[in-house]
C-alpha cells in the first residue's frame, strides 16, 4: 500500500516538486513515507480523512479564522510533519503550499471533491491566516 502511494505521488507530483524544491526534497518525502511503520501509516491516513471532515465542517462556518478553521490548520500541520519529517516544517512553507493548492487543479479537484465546492480556497485562506500567526 505504501509503495503504491509513493509511486502515485511521484507520478502525479514528482516532476513539479523536483523542479520547484529539488530532488533532495522529493527523495526525503518518499523516504519518510517508505520508512513509516504500519501504525504511523495508518495514523497518517486516518488524520488525512479527519482533515477532510474538518475542512467540510470549517467551510460551513464561513470563517477561515474561526475555531473550526484553526483546528483544521493544526491538523494539517501535523499531517505535513508526519510526511515531511521532524524539523522540516515551517509556517512559511505551509502557507506557500496552501497557495499552491489553489493554483493546481489537481489539488482543487481533491479538496473540492472531498469537502465541497470552495473547500480549496477556504483551506488556503485558513492556512495563510493561521501560518501568519505561528
Located regions from the model:
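Amphipathic alpha-helical "stalk" segments
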Residues: 1-134
